């Protein structure tokens, strides 16, 4: 489905990604983890077309999409819930979800997807008429994910879904990420919380200083001495 091949990218003259290669398969949950500043968000932005590549390529469903305009990436079946949530605060929960389905012309399908998101996140159903700015941080994260799902993506990109969210809500959100994957979408989740991400991902890539430092099945990484010591605090 998604392949990054030897991707080099950055901002202006500052190259921050140095030969990133990774893969996400159909209906698979993959984690991209590592410390702040490792280049995880930049990697997602290369996929969505927000950051131009200076080397390598991004391939999606066997097609090179490097350099694709941001607005065209959604039409390929890729959707992103960015870091910081970025919901429309002056719109209601329902209106935010409708905005997420702006490419969907079938009204019945829009209604069906909204109903599914409300079943996934009952709190949003309870607050469907509230302004997004009145929601808690966790509820806004639910809304941001729901809005990203509205386009019916085959690949969902999630950037730091646990950031600024209460632990009890984070656990609930991660359970729903698994449900989204089971419903048919592959998921690439970026996280600083390594243990949390590895618990739901089939495979993971550990990124440090713009490079992939480790990769493999999550179960193996959870028993890796470097991961245990550096990220999970287990000596």
Predicted features along the sequence, with ranges:
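Conserved ABC ATPase signature
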Residues: 131-135, 139
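Helix-to-loop junction immediately C-terminal to a conserved catalytic motif
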Residues: 48
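The feature captures the beta-strand-to-loop junction immediately N-terminal to the Walker
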Residues: 33-35
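ABC-type ATPase nucleotide-binding domains, specifically the catalytic core motifs of the NBD
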Residues: 12, 30, 68, 93-112, ...
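ABC ATPase C-loop
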Residues: 148-149
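Conserved ABC transporter NBD signature motif
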Residues: 56-65, 76, 109-114
């Amino acid at each position: 489905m998604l392949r990054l091949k030897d991707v080099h990218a950055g901002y202006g003259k500052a190259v921050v990604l140095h030969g990133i290669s990774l893969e996400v398969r159909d209906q698979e949950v993959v984690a991209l983890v590592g410390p702040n500043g490792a280049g995880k968000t930049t990697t997602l932005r290369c996929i969505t077309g927000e950051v131009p590549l200076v080397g390598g390529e991004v391939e999606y469903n066997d097609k090179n999409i490097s350099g694709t305009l941001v607005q065209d990436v959604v039409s390929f079946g890729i959707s992103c819930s960015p870091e910081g949530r970025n919901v429309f605060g002056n719109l209601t929960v329902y209106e935010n979800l409708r905005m997420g389905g702006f490419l969907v012309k079938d009204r019945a399908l829009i209604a069906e997807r909204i109903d599914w998101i409300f079943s996934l996140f009952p709190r949003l159903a309870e607050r469907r008429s509230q302004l997004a700015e009145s929601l808690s941080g966790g509820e806004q994260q639910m809304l941001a994910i729901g809005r990203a799902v509205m386009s019916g993506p085959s690949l969902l990109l999630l950037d730091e879904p646990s950031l600024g969210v209460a632990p009890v809500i984070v656990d609930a959100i991660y359970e729903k990420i698994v449900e989204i994957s089971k419903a048919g979408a592959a998921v690439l989740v970026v996280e600083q919380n390594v243990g949390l991400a590895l618990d739901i991902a089939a495979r993971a890539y550990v990124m440090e200083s713009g490079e992939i430092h480790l990769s493999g099945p999550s179960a193996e990484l959870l028993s890796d001495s470097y991961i245990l010591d550096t990220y999970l605090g287990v000596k």
